[in-house]
UniProtKB/Swiss-Prot annotation:
Residues 131-140 have a biased composition (Basic and acidic residues). Disulfide bonds: none annotated. Residues 107-121 have a biased composition (Basic residues). It comes from Homo sapiens. CDD domains: RING-HC_RNFT2 (cd16742). The chain crosses the membrane at residues 182-202, 215-235, 256-276, 330-350. One of its GO terms (molecular function) is zinc ion binding. This is E3 ubiquitin-protein ligase RNFT2. The gene is RNFT2. It holds the Pfam family zf-RING_2. The keyword Plastid does not apply. Residues 13-41, 92-149 are annotated as: Disordered. The keyword Nucleotidyltransferase does not apply. GO terms for cellular component: membrane.
Length: 444
C-alpha cells in the first residue's frame, strides 16, 4: 500500500513540474539555460556556440539599421540571411562577466569589440574573407620572392649586351692592327711553325735511340739555320741580332709593338739554337756518349737556354720603360724599373735554381736498379716489355720487373713509375729529358 501511495505522489510531482516548465516564458527559459552554461564554464574560455532559432528576421538585414544589443549572446554567432553574406562575430566574454551571469541568473549583453559585416555583393562568409586575405598576402609574398635578378647576373647581362654592340668595332680595330703589322705577324707565324716542326722531329729521333737517322738530324740543323739567317738578313737594317748579345737594335723609337717584335725574334732564334745543340747530342754515337746519359745533357741545355732567354729582354724593357723622350717623367720611369727589376729577380732566381739542379743531376750517376740474373730474365720471359725484344743489359727494379737498361732509362726520362705495375721507380727531375724544348714565349 505504501509503495502505491509513494508512486502516486511522485507522479503528481512530475506532472506539476512539467506544467511549471511549460508555462515559463521563453526569455526566462533562455536566461536559465545561459546561466547554467556559464556556471559550468566558470573560466569563460570555452563559451558555447548557440544559434538563435527564434531570432527575428531583422537580425541579418545588414547594416542599414541599428542592431539591438540585447539580441546577441556573449558567444560567437554565425548566420546568414536568405540572400547570404551577413556575418556577425561576438568576442568571448571575460571571466567576471561569466561569473556575474552565473550568479545573477540574468543575461546582460556585452557590446561586441569587432563587428564584421559583408554585404551580399561581396561574399558568403567570414571564412571566405579570411582565406581570401591569406591567399592575397601569400600571392604578394610569392611575387616578391623571385625579385629582381642578382647584381652579378645583371652586370653580366650588361657586359654581354655591351660586347654585342661593340663587337663590330673591336673587330674593325683588330683588323686595322693586323693590317698595319701584317709582315711581323706573318714572320712570327712562320717561325712558330718552324719551331713546332723541328721540336717534334727531334723528339721522334731521340725516342729511336741508336736507330736515329743522322740525315734527319742534319736536315733539322740546316732548316733551322736557313730560317734564322733569312730572317736576320731580311731585317738587317734593324740589326736584330744585337739583342742576342745585350746590345741595342737599330731603331729610332721603341714603342710597344716594336718591343714585342724584337723580343719575339730573339726568343725564336734562341729556341733554334737550343734545338741545334740537342741535335748534336743526338747525333753523337754510343761510344762517345751512352744513350742513358743523353737525357741529362738535354736537361742541362734546356735549363741554360731558359735562363739566357729570360735575360735577353731585360735591357729592351729598360729602354722601353724610360723612353727616349726627355719630357717623360723620370720619377715614374724609375718606379716602374724598380718594380720590373723586383719581378724579374724572382724569375731569374727560379731559373738559376733549375740550372743548379740540372748540373747536380749531371754530375751524379743515376742507378734505376741492379743487374738482373739469367734466372730472373728467364722468369720474365726473356723479352723486354718496352721494346718487345730480347734483353740487352737487363735491369731489375724494386718491384721485381726486368727491362733493358736503355729502354728503362728512356722510359724514366718521361715517367717516374714502372711501365707494368706503376709503382714509383725514381723521384728525380724528368722534365726535358726527352729532348723537348719549351714553347713558352718569353715576353718580359
Amino acid at each position: 500500500m505504501w509503495l502505491f501511495t509513494v508512486n502516486q505522489v511522485l507522479r503528481k510531482m512530475q506532472r506539476r513540474h512539467s506544467s511549471n516548465t511549460d508555462n515559463i516564458p521563453p526569455e526566462r527559459n533562455r536566461s536559465q539555460a545561459l546561466s547554467s552554461e556559464a556556471s559550468v564554464d566558470e573560466g569563460g574560455v570555452f563559451e558555447s556556440l548557440k544559434a538563435e532559432a527564434a531570432s527575428p528576421p531583422a537580425l541579418f538585414s545588414g547594416l542599414s539599421g541599428s542592431l539591438p544589443t540585447s539580441s546577441f549572446p556573449s558567444s560567437l554567432v554565425l548566420g546568414s540571411s536568405a540572400g547570404g553574406g551577413d556575418v556577425f562575430i561576438q568576442m568571448p566574454a571575460s571571466r567576471e562577466e561569466g561569473g556575474g551571469r552565473g550568479e545573477g541568473g540574468a543575461y546582460h549583453h556585452r557590446q561586441p569589440h569587432h563587428h564584421f559585416h559583408h554585404g551580399g555583393h561581396r561574399g558568403g562568409s567570414l571564412l571566405q574573407h579570411v582565406g581570401g586575405d591569406h591567399r592575397g598576402h601569400s600571392e604578394e609574398g610569392g611575387d616578391e620572392q623571385p625579385g629582381t635578378p642578382a647584381p652579378a647576373l645583371s652586370e653580366l647581362k650588361a657586359v654581354i649586351c655591351w660586347l654585342q654592340k661593340g663587337l663590330p668595332f673591336i673587330l674593325i680595330l683588330l683588323a686595322k692592327l693586323c693590317f698595319q703589322h701584317k709582315l711581323g705577324i706573318a714572320v712570327c707565324i712562320g717561325m712558330a711553325s718552324t719551331f713546332a716542326y723541328a721540336n717534334s722531329t727531334l723528339r721522334e729521333q731521340v725516342s729511336l735511340k741508336e736507330k736515329r737517322s743522322v740525315l734527319v738530324i742534319l736536315w733539322i740543323l740546316a732548316f733551322l739555320a736557313g730560317n734564322t739567317l733569312y730572317v736576320l738578313y731580311t731585317f738587317s737594317s734593324q740589326q736584330l741580332y744585337n739583342s742576342l748579345i745585350f746590345l741595342k737594335p737599330n731603331l729610332e723609337m721603341l714603342d710597344f709593338f716594336d718591343l714585342l717584335w724584337i723580343v719575339g725574334i730573339a726568343d725564336f732564334v734562341l729556341k733554334y739554337i737550343t734545338i741545334a745543340l740537342k741535335c748534336l747530342i743526338v747525333a753523337l754515337p754510343k761510344i762517345i756518349l751512352a744513350v742513358k746519359s743523353k737525357g741529362k745533357f738535354y736537361l742541362v741545355i734546356e735549363e741554360l737556354s731558359q735562363l739566357f732567354r729570360s735575360l735577353v729582354p731585360i735591357q729592351l724593357w729598360y729602354k722601353y720603360i724610360m723612353g727616349d723622350d726627355s719630357s717623360n717623367s723620370y720619377f715614374l720611369g724609375g718606379v716602374l724599373i724598380v718594380l720590373y727589376s723586383l719581378c724579374k729577380s724572382f724569375d731569374i732566381c727560379g731559373r738559376v735554381g733549375g740550372v743548379r739542379k740540372a748540373l747536380k743531376l749531371l754530375c751524379t750517376s743515376q742507378n734505376y736498379g741492379v743487374r738482373a740474373t739469367g734466372q730472373q730474365c728467364t722468369e720474365a720471359g726473356d723479352i723486354c716489355a718496352i721494346c718487345q725484344a730480347e734483353f740487352r743489359e737487363p735491369l731489375i727494379l724494386l718491384c721485381q720487373h726486368v727491362f733493358c737498361e736503355e729502354c728503362l732509362c728512356l722510359w724514366l726520362d718521361r715517367e717516374r713509375t714502372c711501365p707494368l705495375c706503376r709503382s714509383v721507380a725514381v723521384d728525380t727531375l724528368r722534365c726535358w729529358k726527352d729532348g723537348a724544348t719549351s714553347a713558352h714565349f718569353q715576353v718580359y
